[in-house]
């Protein structure tokens, strides 16, 4: 097709899409799907990638082993290669050091050793769990891709007993690495631009979407970049639309803290210690036909005349794609909210995944690090950044494109993992599949600020002004005959307090009657004023 050259003085012709006011480039591309019959997405939504047949040969392994031993001797380090593990991205040569030789001596010459061996970079593993050796990890000439489908289709993922299983990728030996977010219980992720951090976060999300139902796990996603997580909008797991406004993101974290305190009150009332015990007790009494009334309900909290029955609590996973932007807007406030959640939220099922491309001490503060013991480092710019996230070096020598170091809770050992890969189309396919299964049940008020609500109340009480939504709500009530506060909340996406205030204003205007036996009547039509 030949490109059409426009005269600089000629106005563009927009008649080609005259049937719509919106250019096709700006229209949301929605794929209509029938509701799937399976309880969870099919692996067929993920692509099969052909394996790379170019692998390292035994002769190459032997040659590199001899070169490593020779170059170490040149640096007055006596060692011999005892074992070799060939992975998808790197090969680890396990060496036995002569008695009296410190592993730190090899680490101190890693840059010189990489230059002598003519590798882009190498990483020295001073400790290999269960072995008396050190490891020298060298990049493979022909890198293997790790498709997400291969990891999710593995026995390790299928048979995992994890509550919140996350597939990270494959380790040095090519074995899938599956971790449990519920046991972490929070995760800090850092990596420079192009390191594969965003793909890694998507891998974690898709792992959960392949294992959990919306009634069991809910997401709050915070996306300062606007484009990274917006693909998940309207999936049924969301508690609120993907948050892109950083001020509203602070409100979402504040809501999480309030929800944490509310859940602890419920656990205390039922005399259980964690979310698992709470849900078991709810199931137990429901099986006996004795639903448990909400012990912290107060008259006026809802329009009900009696306390509603308790339901099982769902896990909540809070994902922040660029934590540094959030800290720039409200650093001290955000730090305190994150610290409170990290300290206490584990037992009641709220878990954090915080990702940043700037692992500096003003972003990952000491207070945050102390309360988030599980970390993942993709490629970073310097040893200082590596120490900031992992408390040790190594991440600066990674190879990018999903190459990562994982440090689990309570362990100083680092696991090198090659992250799973999926395309943007695969992410869209899975999100569309979940959207076809149902709509999200958003909770009003998550993004609202308590200060805004208080100022709104003061403005109405002092000046007597009607709520800006008053006319619309009044028309809705008169036309539908519905006088419940909950219906106003759902229709206009407002919190309970605001909806109740509008209902009170309609009562003052004589449009609806006072509450009688939990109901109101419509008394008149639109007033003249």
UniProtKB/Swiss-Prot annotation:
- Organism from which the protein derives: Haemophilus influenzae (strain ATCC 51907 / DSM 11121 / KW20 / Rd)
Query: Subunit notes for this chain?
Result: Homohexamer. Forms a ring that surrounds DNA.
Q: Which GO terms describe its molecular function?
A: ATP binding; DNA binding; DNA translocase activity
The gene is ftsK
Alphabetically, which GO biological process terms does the record hold? Answer: cell division; chromosome segregation
CDD domains referenced in this protein's UniProt entry, alphabetically: TrwB_TraG_TraD_VirD4
Signal peptide range in chain numbering: none
Residues bound to ATP are: 194-199
What more does the entry say?
Although strongly related to FtsK, it lacks the typical transmembrane domains located at the N-terminal part of FtsK.
**InterPro entries xrefs:** FtsK/SpoIIIE/SftA, FtsK_alpha, FtsK_dom, Ftsk_gamma, P-loop_NTPase, WH-like_DNA-bd_sf, WH_DNA-bd_sf
Question: What is the name of the protein in this document?
Answer: DNA translocase FtsK
- Which Pfam families does the UniProt entry name for this protein? FtsK_alpha, FtsK_gamma, FtsK_SpoIIIE
UniProt region (Disordered), positions on chain: 1-20, 509-529
UniProt cross-references to SMART domains, sorted A to Z: Ftsk_gamma
The alphabetized UniProt keywords are: ATP-binding, Cell cycle, Cell division, Chromosome partition, DNA-binding, Nucleotide-binding
PANTHER family in UniProt = DNA TRANSLOCASE FTSK, SPORULATION PROTEIN RELATED
User: What family does this chain come from, according to its entry?
Assistant: Belongs to the FtsK/SpoIIIE/SftA family.
